[in-house]
A protein has these predicted regions:
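Regulatory and interdomain segments flanking nucleotide-handling catalytic cores
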Residues: 1-127
Length: 127
């Protein structure tokens, strides 16, 4: 566990199915359009997140983002803002898991996905 550090993992919901369907149907124009939207969205989300003091992008690409956040800088409403912006830019939803370790963040992301997506699940954040 990293004292004072939280991890936020975000992942677009059902993106793989959209890509698979486009490829299987031979609709490369749709896949290309989705890819461009995802690239733009992830660049935008990365900039939005990194503009917050204490927030650092660990990785961002495809429909995934990982953010290391100083505990005192964490704001749940900012995660919701990132989720809303992803939807505005792509038309799809995004789930997030936040945890006191990268493993916990990943588990919380998997929980959010298992519950249907478009959800933020967090560990209890220490005060």
């Amino acid at each position: 566990m990293n004292m004072g550090l939280l991890f936020a993992l975000g992942d677009g919901d059902k993106v793989r199915a959209l890509i698979d369907n486009g490829l299987l149907d031979g609709k490369l124009d749709k896949v290309k359009e989705l890819s461009q939207k995802l690239t733009c969205a992830m660049q935008t989300l990365s900039k939005m997140a990194s503009d917050n003091p204490g927030w650092q992008i660990v990785f961002s690409g495809g429909d995934d983002i990982c953010i290391a956040i100083e505990e005192l800088s964490y704001r749940e409403e900012m995660i919701h803002t990132l989720m809303e912006r992803f939807q505005e830019l792509t038309g799809g939803t995004m789930s997030f898991g936040v945890g006191t370790s990268i493993e916990n963040a990943y588990i919380n992301l998997r929980r959010a996905k298992a519950r249907g997506g478009n959800i933020l699940i967090t560990d209890p954040i220490p005060n």
